Swiss-Prot record:
InterPro entries in the cross-refs: Ribosomal_uL10, Ribosomal_uL10-like_sf, Ribosomal_uL10_bac, Ribosomal_uL10_bac_type
Subunit structure: Part of the ribosomal stalk of the 50S ribosomal subunit. The N-terminus interacts with L11 and the large rRNA to form the base of the stalk. The C-terminus forms an elongated spine to which L12 dimers bind in a sequential fashion forming a multimeric L10(L12)X complex.
CDD domains linked: Ribosomal_L10 (cd05797)
Domain of life the protein comes from: Bacteria
Gene Ontology, cellular component aspect: ribonucleoprotein complex; ribosome
Official protein name in the record: Large ribosomal subunit protein uL10
SUPFAM superfamilies linked: Ribosomal protein L10-like
Gene Ontology MF, one: large ribosomal subunit rRNA binding
Keywords: Ribonucleoprotein, Ribosomal protein, RNA-binding, rRNA-binding
HAMAP family: Ribosomal_uL10 (MF_00362)
Length: 172
């Protein structure tokens, strides 16, 4: 990489660290190209990204961001997984690490909070924002459905009473 390319890469990575909902740092030593491509495609499908960066450039890119506390994690062969949703990157990384022992989670960051490996693991167990929105919407809709049923019940009962009277009059 030439100096201009490095500068551009650091600027791009700095924007990533500033804009991401969460960042996960992991070792990938010994992982095959096929495994890394599979990992990248799973992360992309979930709405995240995986990058491999030189540790020195990643540390420079971290300066001036909320995630600056994770700069000590960049030792050895490290990768960066990030997403706008705070739950997506940790969830995909932890799911992939369960089936692949070559991916070792070192830690991460969510906003100003620096996470160790256990913190990333516990963050991965939380439901995503979309799942939480769906649950909240379901909780909001349930009472409305019940209220509509209660309001409509007297009218339907009244209609049944009129229908019964009409049938009684016809029979008589």
């Amino acid at each position: 990489m030439e100096r201009a390319e490095k500068r551009e890469f650091v600027t791009e990575l700095n924007e990533v660290f500033k804009a991401s909902g969460s960042v996960v740092v992991a070792h990938y030593a010994g992982a095959t190209v096929a495994q890394m491509n599979d990992f990248r495609s799973k992360m992309r499908a979930a709405g995240g990204t995986v990058k491999v960066a030189k540790n020195r450039l990643a540390k420079i890119a971290l300066q001036g961001t909320e995630a600056e506390g994770i700069s000590n994690l960049f030792k050895g062969q490290t990768l960066i997984a990030y997403s706008n949703d705070p739950i997506t990157a940790p969830k995909v990384v932890m799911d992939f690490a369960k089936t692949n022992d070559k991916i070792v989670v070192l830690g991460g960051a969510m906003g100003t909070t620096t996470l160790n490996a256990e913190g990333v693991k516990s963050l991965a167990t939380l439901p995503s924002l979309d799942e939480l929105r769906a649950k909240l919407l379901g909780m909001i809709q349930t009472p409305a459905t019940r209220i509509a049923g209660v309001v409509a019940a007297p009218a339907s009962q009244l209609a049944r009473v009129f229908s019964a009277y009409a049938k009684k009059d016809e029979a008589a």
